Amino acid sequence: MPGTVDALVGPEWNGEVAFAPGNASFQAFVTALRVLEGEDAAAAWVDGMAANDPELTENNLASLDLVNTGEVELGLINHYYWFRQAAEVGAENMRAQLKFLPGDPGGIVNVTGAAILKGAEGDEDALAFVEYLVSEKAQEYFVEETFEYPLLPGIAAPEGLPSIESLVNPELDLSDLESLEQTQQLLADAGLI
């Protein structure tokens, strides 16, 4: 497996990569690629991927299924899809294996957040909901059922998942990923969405 997403435009990967270009996390990754490597490099990568006859899927699970059936060699997915399927069928019954790309735009650690809207600061239900999301019970659910990284210290990540501290994220301010419309246009121009 390559150590960088840049390698995926090589001829050896022609017809061997699956991904879901309409997926929000894939689009966040391409946006990160634009921010980290520049517009020209990102456009060249997207065009190279489009020219490399990829298997375009509706979602990450479909990409994972194509790897597991041997139709492609590699799928660009979020880790938790692999863990969910492994919990259902057993990791030993899966052809697909996970690879994290340290320091590469393909290995960004993205986040999800919750906040209370300005003007709703006194809404007790909104506050209770946000407090619940960061409670031990909810964080254990995210680990055990959705195979996500926990926010609270003292709650272990899902078994088999590298510690979040061990992942090498590229130098990226996630607030710079706001230009989603340009990413979608880039993907559309390449015929991927």
Name each region found by the language model:
Residues 15-21, 46-50, 56-57, 92-118, 132-156:
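Periplasmic-binding protein-like
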Residues 34, 110-122, 141:
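A bilobed periplasmic-binding-protein/Venus flytrap-type ligand-binding module shared by bacterial periplasmic
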Residues 73-95:
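A ligand-binding cleft/hinge motif common to bilobed small-molecule-binding domains
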